[in-house]
């Protein structure tokens, strides 16, 4: 009935309708026809938001659920501006700014970003550290880890280490080491279908179960890397309950020493599922 259904699998459409109900499903389908919002995140390692607002060559609008994120108009080209090459900001999807915003990192913490490439979340975690403590940014893909390193360097991060390891290999070196850990887990990518229709092919090839099992393996390793009393923030870009609530259910059932911590809403319309 709408253009988006031309590339969304029927099984996925039916699944979303069952999950959301008629009213929310209609709003979800309508979202495919709405414009994409573009964002940049000010790198507070190099400049304050107040100072950047004074010198910004772009028309900016604050993203309400972040401390240092801004919308910019489609007509702008921030990736071609000298400020970008100076590392004053990172171009990032507005919603993708949320995980690093929510993880309560403080200067002096030892932090792990376990699935870190290309570096949008790692560079914000580093900014929250303000040069104190340390950040280990890991990505299993060597080529993606190179892009991660490039962005870490561009943002002027001096207390980060970039590695490319499967999470289980980190346990022998870093068991019980980290105060805060971010798992931005590999997933079926359902939340990316509007931006990148090519993700649909991956969804059809692998399915939800493949990523659910992958996430469980990551969880099994990461829980061993956290200090007692430390915090893990888990995020995905998918709607799949198996990969979201299901993964948290797996963690809590297998590691009862963990408990869910309620996150206060940063924005009244930014609701959690």
Residues covered by each model-derived region:
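S-adenosylmethionine
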Residues: 1-273
